[in-house]
Design a protein with these regions (language model features):
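Bacterial N-terminal signal peptides that target proteins for export
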Residues: 2-13
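Generic short N-terminal amphipathic or hydrophobic helices
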Residues: 5-6, 22, 320
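Bacterial N-terminal signal peptides
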Residues: 12-22
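N-terminal membrane-sensor/transducer module of prokaryotic signaling receptors
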Residues: 27-324
């Protein structure tokens, strides 16, 4: 027969094991959520084919008829969670099946909860012919909750473009305001340092892993406007290489998209990137970039797993710049 002391010890050990397993499971779930990709390649190919089909349809039909079809909830261009929206290059919405209130409205400054100007980003993608970007938008299949979305946009002609996207529903999407403010301050500090000390001295400081511009996983990266890597303290082997077409695990060209932001002066963007504290595994990152001058730009980013990023609880915000 077991003594009461042994039985109590057994209960305590079992309880400790349960707590340990629960913590491990939670950590694993968090890591999965911050590193999620569109792991079904057919989803990406389906998205591309869907947008190209809509683009070709728009080129074959007159614009009014095409936009009417794109705005039809029960039409041929609404397939599950895939649907087509369309804008002209001024940012005027010309078609949307789930936001009829958008049609005819100027949405060029439409901003998601983390400061990403999604219509400008999608327009830049389509100006290149076609390309991907990330943004947050309400998911009509999930009670209009704000969710991260990988969008794909394609130019119809010189006047307008069409787009669609795939929701990444499990990823945390809201980066705390304090984290974003600290990110902006860090980048501003780096730009000021570059302006006061010159490009050569600044790049030397930015690439010093033991220097003041590497603070754990918060560090400065820098490129010229051709996509040549100038500062990557955790990836020195990439310095001097052409990274213009570098893609994340979902095919998003994050350097090109960053250049788009820098050409506007500054801006936010999402991408998946190697996390130095996780053996360089890719995970969701919110980046902020600024131009230094007409020749080069710099930026930094915060990882979702390290900034207390959270999931949506409701559709909270899709506003215009200056209204938040």
């Amino acid at each position: 027969m077991h003594s009461p002391a042994i039985m109590r010890l057994t209960v305590v050990l079992c309880a400790m094991l349960f707590v340990f397993l629960a913590i491990a499971s939670s950590a694993s779930a968090t890591e999965d959520k911050t590193s999620k990709t569109v792991n079904n390649s057919s989803s990406i190919s389906e998205l591309i084919d869907f947008v190209k089909e809509a683009r070709d349809y728009a080129r074959e039909e007159d614009k009014e008829s095409a936009c009417q079809e794109f705005s039809n909830k029960t039409g041929r261009f609404v397939r599950g969670d895939l649907y087509i929206y369309a804008y002209d290059f001024r940012g005027i919405n010309v078609a949307h099946p789930f936001r009829p209130d958008f049609i005819g409205e100027d949405k060029i400054n439409l901003t998601d909860p983390n400061g990403v100007v999604l219509i400008k980003d999608l327009a830049d993608c389509s100006r290149r012919g076609e390309d991907f970007t990330y943004f947050i938008f309400p998911n009509p299949d999930h009670g209009s909750e704000d969710e991260l979305k990988i969008g794909y946009a394609a130019k119809v002609d010189e006047n307008w473009w069409v787009g669609s996207g795939v929701y990444l529903s499990d990823l945390p999407v809201f980066f705390p305001l304090e984290s974003r403010e600290n990110l902006v301050s860090f980048v501003d500090e780096a730009v000021k340092y570059a302006e006061e000390n010159g490009k050569e001295a600044a790049l030397q400081a930015f690439n010093d892993r033991n220097g003041s511009f590497v603070r754990g996983n918060l560090y400065i990266f820098a490129y010229d406007f051709n996509g040549t890597a100038l500062s990557l303290p955790y990836q020195p082997e990439l310095l001097g290489s052409d990274r213009l077409d570098a893609k994340d695990a979902n095919g998003v060209r994050f350097v090109q998209n960053s250049i788009d932001q820098a050409k506007r002066g500054r801006g936010y963007l999402y991408y998946l990137y190697a996390n130095p504290s996780k053996n360089m595994e890719e995970e969701l990152k919110l980046g902020y970039v600024r131009s230094v001058d007409n020749n080069w730009w710099l930026g930094a980013g915060i990882y979702a797993s390290e900034s207390n990023a959270t999931n949506a609880t409701s559709s909270t915000y899709l506003g215009e710049i200056g209204r938040n």
